[in-house]
């Protein structure tokens, strides 16, 4: 990104992956629907095959369980929980792959944001994700819960620099097709949905 100078970017990347490891990332509100444990299970399989690091960005009710799973797998040194972050584009700009194994996604905006930063996406085929993530081009789609399939696709993208670059370029190109005129209504829909759910919850509490 223009705000994040190349020298800063390389320094940041070197700090997180000192030996040139591939960097995978996940961003969410750490709720059950995000299937955060699947993120870790996918990464575990990737990590067995190649040097890699995982950045877990965000916070929520499933974070503690995710951290406990990391400890049980002895992967604390390779998985970093960064909490909520304001400069998302800066963090995404150093990632090589974005993992989104959600049970459901209305629009897949986090996947779109990753692609806009040039990060290919490994996701499920849930909800609106197939419209955002083009299978075999900007990343890959897998059935919900199929961590083996997701890991296989991840390794396919990460196996060599040329393949990774092809997916990165395609991700940026596809993200650009989502102009503001298309994105703003999606955000408005999302806010309307959240607001409606909140009002419904409040009415049930009364």
Where are these regions (language model features)?
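A short helix/loop element that forms part of the nucleotide-sugar donor recognition site in Leloir-type
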Residues: 5-18, 200
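Conserved donor-binding/catalytic core segment of Leloir-type glycosyltransferases
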Residues: 18-34, 40-43
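Nucleotide-activated donor-binding/catalytic signature segment of Leloir-type glycosyltransferases, i.e.
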Residues: 67-83
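Aromatic "clamp/platform" in nucleotide-sugar-dependent glycosyltransferases that forms part
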Residues: 84, 103
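Short hydrophobic beta-strand element within catalytic cores of glycosyltransferases
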Residues: 120-123, 133
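Conserved acidic donor-binding segment of nucleotide-sugar-dependent glycosyltransferases
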Residues: 135-136, 140-147, 156-161
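A short, well-ordered alpha-helix in the C-terminal region of glycosyltransferases
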Residues: 149, 156, 163-177, 186-189
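C-terminal alpha-helical cap of glycosyltransferases
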Residues: 180-206
